Amino acid sequence: MCQAMTKWDFKERPLHERPQAEQDAWWAEVRAANAHVCRRLREACGMELDSVYDLVNKHNNYPQAIPTLLELLGEVDNPNIKEGIVRALAEKSAIGVAADRLIQEFRRVAPHNPGLGWVIGNSLAFVARKEHVPAILALLNDKRFGDARQPLPDALKVADRSTAVAACRWLLEDPDTRWCTLKLIGRRKLTELGEGVKRIADGPKHPMQRDAAKVYAKLIESTPGAD
């Protein structure tokens, strides 16, 4: 099992400002974790990769790799390589299959690494099915996860309309989830939420205000009897 060094915390001091020996040790750890992932995928699936990010950038439709990628989530702790594994799971053949494992990983990672938590949430929103909505709503309602929750409202694309509307009402009030919620409202044309969207559109100038105005215009167009 590849274990990440717990001493790596770059909030106070970025990697490039650290002594060369520490930088070398960091990259050695990244290379070791990546080699482990590539070896496992080669042995399990016959895939020849230079990096786990080859799956993200060069490949699509690799159902044979999904079970091994899910196992690797528990084997690799290096955040750089774990991010590649998580991003590789945002793949059509992982829909439904990877969601439960990503929910577990989100709970474990997001409180102390919101950046990686955000990536996990993004992949989770992609692979979630209707049966995962209650667990995802619980994550969205837990403020301990902070802005790692930002992409999770997109998972409500698979929810019943009534569930999506009810959830989006309170998600619009949360600064961490508001923007993604607006986009979901626009895509699903949740006209029941027009008043809340208009309130944001009429608010202080901000890129989100412009997006809210566009969403509100789309909702008006979708409202029966609208001029």
Where in the sequence are the language-model features?
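Ankyrin repeat arrays, specifically the small/polar loop and inter-repeat linker segments at the C-terminal end
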Residues: 110-111
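Buried hydrophobic core positions in alpha-solenoid tandem helical repeats
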Residues: 37, 68-71, 100-106, 135-140, ...
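Core helices of alpha-solenoid repeat scaffolds
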Residues: 34, 62-66, 95, 99, ...
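Non-catalytic, polymerase-adjacent accessory regions of viral genome-replication enzymes
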Residues: 1-6
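Short, intrinsically disordered/low-complexity patches at protein termini
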Residues: 105-106, 202-205, 217-219
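Structural detector for internal amphipathic alpha-helices that build alpha-solenoid repeat scaffolds
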Residues: 10-28, 39-62, 71-75, 80-95, ...
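TPR/TPR-like (Sel1-like) alpha-helical repeat modules
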Residues: 174, 198-205
